[in-house]
Amino acid sequence: MNDIILTGSSRGLGHSLFMLLSRMDNTRVSVVGRRFSAEEEQEAYSCIHWDLTEPNHMPSINPQQFIDTESLAFINNAGTVEPIGEIGTLSDELLQQAAQVNFISPMMFCNQLVKFCRERHIKLKIVNISSGAANYAIAGWAAYCATKAAFKMFLDVLSEQYKGSEDAEVVHVDPGIMDTGMQEQIRSVDEKAFPRLSEFRAYHANGKLRAPDDVAQEILRKYII
């Protein structure tokens, strides 16, 4: 049996991934989040209750749920682009939440996953839904750029740790610009907060945003199936 743990399954790309994964043979998908829809409660193998803004409340992995697991994949999809704005104007609370959701919580969870899989000789794959923001600076996205880059580096170190081994694999996926709630958030700010606002509004107006379902199918085909 192949197990998958997915964060951010309630909407956007995460929801598309969840719907596809829940229909795959020989695959069980567990979802992580604050709350779950009736659909998730019904279709998921397990619902792991955890608000990623509270890393100290991270749940322990239940060994009984994965007793017959041959391979385990963690899809790190949850993320927040807030706060958007100039450095010097940002909310301390939102900065902290960005660090917790985009970096601290997934880092801690991956640390637990590596230990869990190593002790049970389970092959681990981590699929990190990343962003160009992890690789270069974007004005107005200081928190997003910094936290995505930090988690990417953490996983790069993990990849280096397992260099030459098949026990763990790390894949970074940049899904591009999609038609999601995050894009709506970005388009709703003012240009002073985000100088590239007109560019992102044009993506939407000109139909340049990718459909999450299409991106999800591509990710599963390349990295999961």
Regions found by a protein language model. Give the residues of each.
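Active-site loop-to-helix junction immediately N-terminal to the catalytic Tyr of the SDR YXXXK motif
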Residues: A137-C145, V157
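Residue(s) in the substrate-gating loop at a strand-loop-helix junction
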Residues: S131
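N-terminal Rossmann NAD(P)H-binding glycine-rich loop of SDR-like oxidoreductase domains
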Residues: S10-M19
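C-terminal helical subdomain
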Residues: A168, H172-P175, T180, S188-I225
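Active-site helix of classical SDR
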Residues: C110, T147
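Rossmann-fold cofactor-recognition segment
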Residues: Q42-N56
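Conserved mid-core segment of classical short-chain dehydrogenase/reductases
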Residues: G79-Q96, K115, G140
